[in-house]
Every structure is written in C-alpha cells, then in structure tokens.
C-alpha cells in the first residue's frame, strides 16, 4: 500500500511504527465558532474512509480529532452573540458531532479540547524554552524558527525569500517567521496563569501538546485540509521535533479544497454551505457519495449539477442492490457453471482485485468506484439474462455480488439505506407474510377474482412492496 506523503511530495510504501498492526492517527479538528461546512465534511469523510480501509485490512486505528475551543474567532463570536465561550463552543461541538453522525463518520477514540489541556501546553512550552527554541517578549512567547534547520520542509519553501516579503512586521519577534506559542491576556479574554504571565495558548502549540499526550512522540499519520500545510502543520512539525529531538510524524496526508466558482469554499470568503443546509436539500449519504467520487487530494467543484450527477450514480448502485436482493429469493444452487456464469464470476473477481489495487494506491476512491460500476453492470446483465428464461440465476454468483457490494459499503461507509447488510429490509416473519399474500393473490387470479387480487397488490404497494409478474411467476421487491 502506498500513501502520498506531503513531507516528501512522493507516494511512499506504508509501514507502521515497528511494523505493528496499530496505527496512530491525528486529524486536526474544527475551530468551533460556527456550523461545519462542506469543506469540513470532505476532510472528515476522507479520513473516515482511510480509517475504514485500514481497519478492513485488519489494522487497529487510534484516531484523535481535537476541538479548538480557544481562539480569536470564538471570542469574537461569543461577544457578538452575548454568550460565554464555553456555551458557544459546546453548541458547535455538538453540532459538528451531529453532522458527522449523519455523514456516517465513525467516532474518534478521543476528542480532546484545548481548554482542558492548558497544563500540557504550558509544560510543552517550558521544554522548548529550556532547550533554547522559545523566547518571551512583551506580547507573548514565540518559537525561534532560526534554531530549527528543517523549517519550511513540509511546504518546501525558501525561508529567506519568504521572510523578505513579509509585510506585517512584529517588532517583538527575533525573526518575522517566528510564531506564537503563548499570547498574553487582553481585557475580557479567557486567561490562565503561566510562568510568563497570564494568557492563553496560541493555535499551533495546541495540537502538538495533545497529540504528544495521546499518541506519543512519534505517530503514523497526521492529516487535515491542504490549507493547514502552512502555517499550521509546518509550525506543529517544527515545535514538536524540537521538543522530541526526533521525527514526529511518518506520513502527512492532506485533503483538497472544495471549490465554488473557482474559489475555495471557506467561511472567510462567505461562499460556504453548511452541512446542515445541505442536509435539508440532499440526503447525508448522497453528500458522502459526492465527496468520495473524487480523489481526496484533488480539488472538488461543488455545483448542483455535480450533486445531481452523483445522485444518479448512487441511484444506479441502489437499483443494482435491489436487483441482487430480489435475485436472492429467485435463484438456485447450481453445480455446473455455464458461460455467462463463468464470465460474471471472472468480472467480480477481477474488479475486486482492481478495487483493492486502487485503494492501495493512496486510497483512490474515484478509481475504485469505476470497478464498482463495472460489477454493477455485469451483475445486472447477468440477472436480466434470466428474466425471460425458464432457468433461475445461480445462487453462488448472486452471493458473490452481494459480498462485493457489502465490502464496498463497509469501506466507503455507504449503502446504509439499502438491503445490503441483511440481504433484505424485511425480517423473516415479514418475508413469510409477503409470500403468503403472493400465494393468496395467485389463487385469486386463478379464480378470476381480479378485484381482490389487485387489492392485495395495491395494499402491498402502499407498504413499499412492489410485485412484478413474469412468465416464471411473481417476484417482489422493495420500492
């Protein structure tokens, strides 16, 4: 399996720490001053699929997603709304978790809050200061980037050129590239005691301290949106490797932007759609499917046409699953395979291998999805081949297709509204009742009691059970 590592700008063969089956993953969480938008959704759906695939390959994934609940934006929004920082943060943390649940994003192991890790942050800064990497000024404590030779490595920037272009000069800094670790308190802001004076943590130090506490001084995967590469992840990397004197993260993974009219979707530009707004127009599963149709690192254009295109694709797959469900009840075990049986089995086998190859190639969901549709086409053709035949489909082939779609659903986190997890939306008692009603309807038709037989058909339709008559008899399926 290969993963594109932002640090090396190359795909690298994935190896866990000490080749163990445990994977430690830290994904930067939201700053909780507003509802999550589609860009957030993309990041956490992408890492959820990465996690699901790793778990499918029998890894144990320890996922940490933090909440930044101390920030200028939160302070300003709380003042605007006349509420406390705690109340505002709690509101939007709960909102975020609700959105993730709807998107079928599996919960993280821990969701640490910055406000609950002040002591760890202070201790982290004290170590940096003791080692000579941090210095106090009139307005806070800063990290000295000149002491870290690898600064700029993640973004691949020329520090001297970038520094010379700096426009906002802070006279308190030794170097304009230096960044804050601790900010001294301003009136009416949250503050904590520290060796340097009352204040609050700066942004970048938060994730370094919390990841150290929960994942240790070296972990497998650190991720987030590509807008975090610089300055956030660059600064995290600098302070963490100076703290630990070793490589901090083995693989850096970043998701691409969601674009609207060729601009990044963001709150600062005001061109964003919250997930809650989108859920009023589309199903959460459709949003998730829309997000996975493109590779996680590619820009994703959000338009209504694109969403509708995704809906058509998802509907096609649901139709296939419905056909498989019906075929389960109308197939038979055969010990000899005919030519179409052999071709269909070969297609399912080959596409399964190609699906895994695509996912092993930097979690390429877009490529993997092509093979899902290839199986969909093949199994529909196979089932339709028997529609007007006296023979029934081979049960083992229907089972193979069912297992394929079940695997895809588990990895992609989709098909939750389908029959794929149980092969039927009905329990055994309901299925038996439907079969009894179908037999009764058949008897009524033989007696030419069409009014009553049609009434049974119509009543079942009201219950979302569709009856389809064919030369081989009547079959039923969910609407």
Curated annotation (Swiss-Prot):
Write out the residues that bind Zn(2+): 28, 207, 232, 236
Q: Per its UniProt record, what InterPro entries does this chain match? A: Cys-tRNA-ligase, Cys-tRNA-synt_Ia_DALR, Cys-tRNA/MSH_ligase, Rossmann-like_a/b/a_fold, tRNA-synt_1_cat_dom, tRNAsynth_Ia_anticodon-bd
* Substrates-to-products reaction catalysed: tRNA(Cys) + L-cysteine + ATP = L-cysteinyl-tRNA(Cys) + AMP + diphosphate
Per the entry, the cofactor note is: Binds 1 zinc ion per subunit.
Q: Name one GO molecular function term.
A: ATP binding
Provide the residue positions that the database annotates as binding ATP. Answer: 267
Q: Which Pfam families match?
A: DALR_2 (PF09190), tRNA-synt_1e (PF01406)
Q: Which NCBIfam families does this chain map to?
A: cysS (TIGR00435)
Q: Return the HAMAP family for the record.
A: Cys_tRNA_synth
Q: What is this protein called?
A: Cysteine--tRNA ligase
